Every structure is written in structure tokens, then in C-alpha cells.
Swiss-Prot record:
Top-level taxonomy: Bacteria, Bacillati, Bacillota, Bacilli, Lactobacillales
Family in the record: Belongs to the SHMT family.
Protein name per the record: Serine hydroxymethyltransferase
Organism the protein comes from: Streptococcus pyogenes serotype M2 (strain MGAS10270)
Location in or out of the cell: Cytoplasm
Modification sites for N6-(pyridoxal phosphate)lysine: 232
Gene: glyA
Length: 420
């Protein structure tokens, strides 16, 4: 009898699946990736995630499991926990959350009850689905009230948020965003929370790598709980992370994750998280994070200098920015689709006080973490901005679009993703 273990080559065993995987590898290699929530992991991260740890069930936590044979995964998970604590300067860390959404769900469970009032950033202003969208579990379970940005500056107005907090008296305030290009003042958010006797939770999923490197202010000293993903700017596997300095809350968080929300943790993913945390603890990671900041600022500046486009809030302090494209093309969806055709990948995005449907939007969102991982710098970032503009302005000129495709290929060839 042929054992399943003999089937070690995906290409030979499942050609149909392999072709799809290979096509995705080619897409990543030859497309410029500007989706702000995406990045490129190291081969070491992929190796850990593809290890034999995927075979092991380990309900519970290190030293307190429900199954036997967990002595090895206990070491793995403890490494991930200790590295996360060191990386972010936190007293406690939970590395079991499967995703950022589940990390947020666990934080809510640890802090508040169903039906409680929560003040979170409105999705249209740059917040995330899990910050109270009515179609999400957060909006269905809790009474979320959204805060926005200032209509003139398109930045957070902390005085206005304080007045809103006084009016609605939330049990919890959520800070953090998925499409906000400015630095967030977590100290001011904590002062607002203290003023109304609310908890403060910070979702730093997008900026975690920048925080780890010290190029963005850390929420850890101010928030009761900090949640994050481990991919995006942190450049690890897709997964979640929860941090706190409060021992009592740490116990509630652990109970909320298991058994509250999840069963067995994904120890192969936790191993990959441990690798990513070690990479982020390397001094070179600070250079990488600063390069993200520099590249994003350089790319945004190109749009700011072109009056056919409007840079939301006038600039960026982190890895992302939004651009209103409606002077040159009907909406963000058309812009996204057109740029896909020239092998530049980004996403349509609502802008503050959006007037178009969320399925169309007035803007596009651009992030520079992935191109920075490829080794691209300020010069290449400026070039990419000019290519985007060239394509959008000439969206009905196939000859010019072909020129853009060729220039994109030259760039990706010059900065290969995974060295052959």
C-alpha cells in the first residue's frame, strides 16, 4: 500500500492546485503590490508555517494543555509569547488568536458585555469592520457609535472625540484604523477614556511593524488592551496578537480566546509568528520600518504635487495614504481595475465623507510595506507614483498602458521577490 507520506511533491500529486499556486507566485513576482494590508514574508516564516507543527493539537496554554505530547509546542508558543512581550514592551501576550478580527473579538469579550456602548472609528473615516460596522459581529453584538475625522483637515480631532465621548458615555473606546494616514496620539485617547471612565483598546494591526521598530508611537503604555495582526507591516504570517500590561485582563483575554472563541491553536502559525518576532527584534528591522515611512512619504508627495489628484489629509505619517482619483477617472473601483491591467495592485477605498457607494468609492488606498520588502527605495516609490498617474490619466490609451506594463516589469525584474 502506498502511504500518504510518499506524496511529497504537490506538483506531481495535484497539478491543478500546483498550477494555481505557481500562478500566484508569478503574480506576486511580476506585479507591484501596494495593498496596505499585504506584505512579503521571509522564507523562514514560510518554512515554520509549513512544518510538522501543523499535525499537533494543543488546546490550552503552555504548561496547561488538555492533550498530551505538547512539550515541544509549549517551547514554540513560549518563544512566541516572550518575543512578542520583548518586541512591544508588554507584560502579557496572547499569540493564539487566528486573526486580527478574532483578536478584537476576544478583547471585546474581556472588557465589555453585549449591548454595551463603544466609541470606535467610523468605517468611512478609516476604521475597520470590527470597529462597529453594522454588517460585522462587532456592530451586531455591541452598541457602537462612530467618531470621524475633522471635515477640514481630515485628521482626528481629539477635542471633538472627547465631547462625543462625554455625550455617549461609552464603556470602551477603540483607537486604530485600516485607512488613516496620520500618527495617532494614544496618550490623548487614554486621557479621553479616563475622563469618561472607559476602557481604551487600540487596534494597531496596520502599524504594528512601525511600532515595533520605534518609528511610530506605541499604544502599549496607554491602552488597557492592544490588538494586532502579525502580517501587514510586521511582516509575519497571517494571524492575531493581543497585548496587555494588566494581569487581570490577561487572564480574561486568555479565557476569551480559549475556550471562548477558539479551540486548538494553530501551532505552525504560532511558530511562524515566533520567527517574525525574532526578525523584528533584529536592529535591521528598524531600518526597514524607516524605509517604509520614507517610501510612503515620497510616493504621496508625487500625488500631492499633481492638482489632478487630492491627497487625503494632505500627507502621511505611516505606511499608507489615500488619494481621491475622481478628477481623472469615475471612481476608485475603475481605478483599481485599470491598475490591475498594468500589474499594479491596490484597492479602491472610501474617503472621509464619501459620496459614492462603498462598491465604487472616490479613492484608492496605497501602502508601501510590500515594495519596501522587495528592496525598493524612494526613487522607485516616486517612479511607481508616476506610473499610477500615467495609467489613470491615460486610461483609454492602450499604447500608453502597454508602456506602463513594460515599465512595471522592468521594476519587478530589478527587485526580485524571492531570489532564485
Amino acid at each position: 500500500m502506498t502511504m500518504i507520506f510518499d506524496k511529497g511533491n504537490v506538483e506531481d500529486f495535484d497539478k491543478e492546485l500546483w498550477d494555481a499556486i505557481h500562478a500566484e507566485e508569478e503574480r506576486q513576482e511580476h506585479h507591484i503590490e501596494l495593498i496596505a494590508s499585504e506584505n512579503m514574508v521571509s522564507k523562514a516564516v514560510m518554512a515554520a508555517q509549513g512544518s510538522v507543527l501543523t499535525n499537533k493539537y494543543a488546546e490550552g496554554y503552555p504548561g496547561n494543555r488538555y492533550y498530551g505530547g505538547t512539550e515541544c509546542v509549549d517551547i514554540v508558543e513560549t518563544l512566541a509569547i516572550e518575543r512578542a512581550k520583548k518586541l512591544f514592551g508588554a507584560a502579557f501576550a496572547n499569540v493564539q488568536a487566528h486573526s486580527g478580527s478574532q483578536a478584537n473579538a476576544a478583547a471585546y469579550m474581556a472588557l465589555i458585555e453585549a449591548g454595551d456602548t463603544v466609541l470606535g472609528m467610523d468605517l468611512a473615516a478609516g476604521g475597520h469592520l470590527t470597529h462597529g460596522s453594522p454588517v460585522n459581529f462587532s456592530g451586531k453584538t455591541y452598541h457602537f457609535v462612530g467618531y470621524s475625522v475633522d471635515a477640514d483637515t481630515e485628521m482626528l480631532n481629539y477635542e471633538a472625540i472627547l465631547e462625543q465621548a462625554k455625550a455617549v458615555q461609552p464603556k470602551l473606546i477603540v483607537a486604530g484604523a485600516s485607512a488613516y494616514s496620520r500618527s495617532i496620539d494614544f496618550e490623548k485617547f487614554r486621557a479621553i477614556a479616563d475622563h469618561v471612565d472607559a476602557y481604551l483598546m487600540v487596534d494597531m494591526a496596520h502599524i504594528a511593524g512601525l511600532v515595533a521598530a520605534g518609528v511610530h508611537p506605541s499604544p502599549v503604555p496607554y491602552a488597557h488592551i492592544v490588538t494586532s495582526t502579525t502580517h501587514k507591516t510586521l511582516r509575519g504570517p497571517r494571524g492575531g496578537l493581543i497585548l496587555t500590561n494588566d494581569e487581570a485582563l490577561a487572564k480574561k483575554i486568555n479565557s476569551a480566546v480559549f475556550p471562548g472563541l477558539q479551540g486548538g491553536p494553530l501551532e505552525h502559525v504560532i511558530a511562524a509568528k515566533a520567527v517574525a518576532f525574532k526578525e523584528a527584534l533584529d536592529p535591521a528591522f528598524k531600518d526597514y520600518a524607516q524605509a517604509i515611512i520614507d517610501n510612503t512619504a515620497a510616493m504621496a508627495a508625487v500625488f500631492a504635487q499633481d492638482d489632478r489628484f487630492r491627497l487625503i489629509s494632505g500627507g502621511t505619517d505611516n505606511h499608507v495614504f489615500l488619494v481621491d482619483v475622481t478628477k481623472v477617472i469615475a471612481n476608485g473601483k475603475l481605478a483599481q481595475n485599470l491598475l490591475d491591467e498594468v500589474n499594479i495592485t491596490l484597492n479602491k477605498n472610501a474617503i472621509p465623507f464619501e459620496t459614492l457607494s462603498p462598491f465604487k468609492t472616490s479613492g484608492i488606498r496605497i501602502g508601501c510595506a510590500a515594495i519596501t520588502s522587495r528592496g525598493m527605495g524612494v526613487k522607485e516609490s516616486q517612479t511607481i507614483a508616476h506610473l499610477i498617474i500615467k495609467a489613470l490619466v491615460n486610461h483609454d490609451q492602450e499604447t500608453i498602458l502597454e508602456e506602463v506594463r513594460q515599465e512595471v516589469r522592468q521594476l519587478t525584474d530589478a527587485f526580485p521577490l524571492y531570489k532564485k
